Regions:
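HTH-adjacent hinge/linker in prokaryotic transcriptional regulators
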Residues: 4-76, 84-90, 96, 100, ...
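Short, flexible loop segments at the rims of nucleotide/cofactor-binding pockets, characterized by
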Residues: 48-52, 72-73, 93, 121-126, ...
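Conserved SAM/SAH-binding loop
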Residues: 80
């Protein structure tokens, strides 16, 4: 499933998972990966300042794959703002997001069109959630979708901490021609 979703080889996924496990970022187990059990459940603001250099590298890598003029969905999560910052110099982007922080960052680029889903603002992580945000997705198709995840199940299914976030991401992935997981 990940091979198809990420459009990379099984060897690439295996190598990346081994690297993440060796650096205690993820915990590898038979048939899948998950959150390192030694990892504390930190607040969003605490997670924002963790691994900043890695998040900027991820942002630069993803931004290098996005052409000018693309339509992009950007999910919620602490890696999404560095990705948005890496996209600031692109021109003609159309951004669809449920992340207020991403919208504010990309609003610095006057050549960027930003579409924000409606719904309830969840202040702890700057996310817009709710049924109206899911309905919003049915009206927008994008070339690229950029997603954050909580973990990966044994069967390769991408998981999140909140079922509403997982449901929203599932709809957004269906609306995206190409997906990136960050």
């Amino acid at each position: 499933m990940l091979v198809k979703q990420l459009e990379v080889s099984a060897q690439t996924i295996r190598r990346d998972i081994i690297h993440l496990d060796e650096h205690s970022i993820l915990k590898r187990h038979h048939g899948g990966i998950g959150i390192n059990p030694g990892t504390k459940s930190l607040s969003y603001s605490s997670r924002e300042i963790e691994n900043v250099t890695a998040k900027k590298c991820i942002g630069a890598a993803i931004a290098s794959k996005i052409p000018d003029g693309a339509s992009i969905f950007i999910d919620i999560g602490t890696t999404m703002e560095p990705i948005a910052e890496a996209l600031l110099n692109h021109s003609g982007l159309t951004i669809v997001t449920n992340h207020i922080g991403v919208a504010l960052i990309l609003s610095q680029n006057p050549d960027c069109t930003i579409l924000i889903s409606g719904g309830q603002l969840r202040s702890r992580d700057k996310a817009i959630i709710g049924e109206s945000s899911i309905q919003f997705l049915s009206q927008n198709r994008v070339t690229f979708g950029i997603f954050g995840i909580g973990s990966i199940a044994n069967d390769g299914q991408l998981l999140d901490y909140d079922y509403r976030d997982a449901q929203f991401s599932r709809y957004a992935m269906e609306a995206s021609r190409t997906t990136f997981v960050a």
